[in-house]
């Protein structure tokens, strides 16, 4: 089973204070770019892996999805999602993404935001997702960018008077233990090439891949984001299940 850090009371409390926890999708700087990768949702059966508070689930239903299922390992997250969701067309399920199984060809779109870098066996998950999707259906997800997850000490450093991102161990894939909101948070580092290969091996065609960084307008409104132009924090991916 994956680490369930989000049910740690201290971690959950810290997470609840993040801007994206308070403001939802509109407070997530990468959301406009991720949204652009999505197909029209009218009439689709949508599955959100690592749904958290259910922000995307509610947006998907409002955007025309016929039914939406949100899956998360955290009971605290799901309790918050249910409290915020009155719509009966949205179902929340507590499950480990490494063992969850909704049934063959039962979904028209699988979406995941910043969850798959917690999954150790993402190869197996991609293969199972391909089985859940109808032929030609889509998978859209974001993860922490491999340049962000690779270093043993993921932080900025001053070199020759300039702030730079320290990058090492990029090709050494596997678990990374970091102190983010709490000590001992375990994430999985993979290269961009590995994500591409695993998707293709699972029966997907890659449609788009984007190392997200803020645009000039976003930086104008949020000057602190300027440093994100020097190091991509998120990797956004869209793929289609082969027929």
Model-identified regions with their sequence ranges:
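Conserved class I S-adenosyl-L-methionine
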Residues: 1-41, 55, 59, 80, 139-174
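Class I SAM-dependent methyltransferase SAM/SAH-binding core
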Residues: 47-49, 53-100
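A short acidic, Gly/Pro-enriched loop at the edge of an enzyme's catalytic core
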Residues: 102-109
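A short glycine-rich, Lys/Arg-flanked "PGG" loop and its adjoining helix->strand segment in the class I
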Residues: 123-138
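Acceptor-substrate binding/catalytic loop of class I
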Residues: 143, 147-149, 180-193
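Short alpha-helix
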Residues: 175, 186-209
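C-terminal lobe and adjacent flexible extensions of AdoMet/dcAdoMet transferase-like proteins
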Residues: 198-243
């Amino acid at each position: 089973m994956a680490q369930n850090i989000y049910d740690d009371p201290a971690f959950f409390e810290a997470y609840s204070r993040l801007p994206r926890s308070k403001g939802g999708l509109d407070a997530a700087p990468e959301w406009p770019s991720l949204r652009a990768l999505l197909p029209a949702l009218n009439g689709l059966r949508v599955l959100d892996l690592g749904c958290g508070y259910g922000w995307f689930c509610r947006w998907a239903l409002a955007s025309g999805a016929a039914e939406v299922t949100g899956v998360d390992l955290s009971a605290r997250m799901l309790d918050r999602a249910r409290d915020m969701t009155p719509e009966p067309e949205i179902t929340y399920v507590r499950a480990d993404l490494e063992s969850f199984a909704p049934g063959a060809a039962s979904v028209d779109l699988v979406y995941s935001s910043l969850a798959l870098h917690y999954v150790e066996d993402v190869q197996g998950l991609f293969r199972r997702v391909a089985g859940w999707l109808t032929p030609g259906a889509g998978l859209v997800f974001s993860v922490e960018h491999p340049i962000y997850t690779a270093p043993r000490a993921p932080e900025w450093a001053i070199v020759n008077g300039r702030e730079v991102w320290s990058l090492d161990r990029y090709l050494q894939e596997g678990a990374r233990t970091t102190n983010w909101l709490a000590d001992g948070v375990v994430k999985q580092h993979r290269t961009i090439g590995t994500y591409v290969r695993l998707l293709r091996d699972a029966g997907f065609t890659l449609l788009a891949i984007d190392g997200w960084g803020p645009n000039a307008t976003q930086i104008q409104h949020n000057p602190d984001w300027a440093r994100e132009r020097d190091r991509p924090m998120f990797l956004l991916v869209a793929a289609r299940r082969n027929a």
